[in-house]
Amino acid sequence: MKKIVELKNPLRDGEILSVSNLSCFFNEKTVHEVKVIDNFSYTFAKNKVYCIIGDSGSGKSTLVNHFNGLIKPAYGDIWVKDIYIGQKQRKIKDFKRLRKTISIVFQFPEYQLFKDTVEKDIMFGPIALGQSKNEARQKAAYYLEKMGLKYTFLERNPFELSGGQKRRVAIAGILAIEPEVLIFDEPTAGLDPEGEREMMRLIKDAKASGRTVFMITHQMENVLEVADEVLVLSKGQLVKSGDPYEVFMDEAFLAHTTIIMPPVIQVIKDLINLNPKFSCLLDFKPRNLDQLADAINNTIAHG
């Protein structure tokens, strides 16, 4: 008789996701074998914004695709609240509940649209996960408006919309599921500066509403703007983590990476080199150029 091993959930109060000893191989046990994730472990708290950065091919997207079951772990364990995703499972239990808990906004979410009206596209996810048509319809109108489009768009064909409008519709469909965790994979790809600012506002709003947010990006100024914690991957390994200033002020670490320092951090470093009194700017930890200007004015005013 097989001994049943009871799995112990490692999550504590205030935590939402735990990853333990996760490894992932492509083309495993062949001459083309590649180790994409290398023994990754981390525990993520609720209601924080995590930015995952690193070179192309460092394993960022592969990592987050494990979080909602798009990729099932071959090695290692993942807990999302009380839902277990593990190497020994044939299939993930509570799969629908997992998808309700974690949703991914892919790099070009507009390519996920496939219905003949905007309303049907937004309603698709909530209905697939068990909501009534009535409830899904109400959420379609609500989240479309949250994305800056009027209710009159509901009956429009999504394929007649502009690229930016399509992206808003696709994101509205994901928000309508009302997940506790949102993952954004290169959310600003192809956006103009105003679109980037709008996306950062969306991420801040998601945190303000109590959600946990993951963002994969190569735009370091956006990382500084929104991140509570930064995780740096290299060849599938977690090589550094901390708040944005801990990461971006570590010159010895950055020297061995291709990470481009955000302009705000570079200006602070230059000012400190000119006059050490500007070291107090590090106490303000400005996240953008406006905050930096305020911090500089404050420093000058108080001599």
UniProtKB/Swiss-Prot annotation:
ATP binds at residues 54-61. GO terms for molecular function: ATP binding; ATP hydrolysis activity; ATPase-coupled transmembrane transporter activity. Its EC number is 7.-.-.-. It is found in: Cell membrane. SMART domains: AAA. It is a peripheral membrane protein. GO terms for cellular component: ATP-binding cassette (ABC) transporter complex. Residues 17-260 form the ABC transporter domain. Signal peptide: none annotated. Keywords: ATP-binding, Cell membrane, Membrane, Nucleotide-binding, Translocase, Transport. Forms a stable energy-coupling factor (ECF) transporter complex composed of 2 membrane-embedded substrate-binding proteins (S component), 2 ATP-binding proteins (A component) and 2 transmembrane proteins (T component). Belongs to the ABC transporter superfamily. Energy-coupling factor EcfA family. ATP-binding (A) component of a common energy-coupling factor (ECF) ABC-transporter complex. Unlike classic ABC transporters this ECF transporter provides the energy necessary to transport a number of different substrates. This is Energy-coupling factor transporter ATP-binding protein EcfA2.
